[in-house]
Amino acid sequence: DRLAHELMEPGKTVYQGIVDAFGMEVLMDTDIDISAPAEGNAVTDNGQSTVNRSIDRKKLGDIVFHDKDKLALLNSISHPLVKEEILRRIEEQKDAGKKLFVIEAALLIQDGYKSICDKMCYVYADLDVRISRLCEYRGFTKERAQAVIDSQESEAFYLEACDYKIDNSGSLENTKKDLKHILDECRI
């Protein structure tokens, strides 16, 4: 998520695609006059300046997590560019002598990462824990948290596709212990 959010910032690769696809209504509200483009700012197809307004992820989420076609559109804009950047960063780190790379993302399997990953691990939590955490840490309502979860593949899909599973319903210490066990097993 961090990399995707980084690439959604004004001037980054994903930003203009999202503005073109979803319009100015997905941008943060501002008191700035946006009637005339300022030098260096992106401009939409209808000639409006984005005035370097950040994408409002809540507004965008309200659109895509209630419409599978719009979610697919967002994913088609962002995911190829995120994957390209991940691969670039991996190569950069390989050149620096690094040997372990961890990619944390919701759609690794769907976006074809299995072909570049030696092992895949599914970290999951009970439904009530997931909803509670989304509400607490991201400020979601229960309805929005459920909509996000409903937009994802089934738990069985991930359990079947991954080499390792970690139950993250409990404490962070237990999750770290399970992860260490996996890393030890992989001799990392």
Protein language model features and the residues they cover:
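ATP-dependent NMP and nucleoside kinases share a basic, alpha-helical "lid"
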Residues: 87-95, 99-137
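Anionic group-transfer/hydrolysis microenvironments
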Residues: 1-3, 106, 112, 169
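Short beta->alpha linker loops
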Residues: 55, 77-78, 125, 149-153, ...
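ATP-dependent small-molecule kinase phosphotransfer cores
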Residues: 5-98
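Small-molecule kinase domains that catalyze NTP-dependent phosphoryl transfer to phosphate-bearing small molecules
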Residues: 85-86, 94, 115, 136, ...
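An amphipathic alpha-helix signature
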Residues: 15-19, 83, 127-135, 142, ...
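Residue-level signal for inorganic ion chemistry
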Residues: 1, 74, 102, 166, ...
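Short, acidic/turn-prone active-site loops that include or flank metal/cofactor-
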Residues: 2-4, 126-128, 172
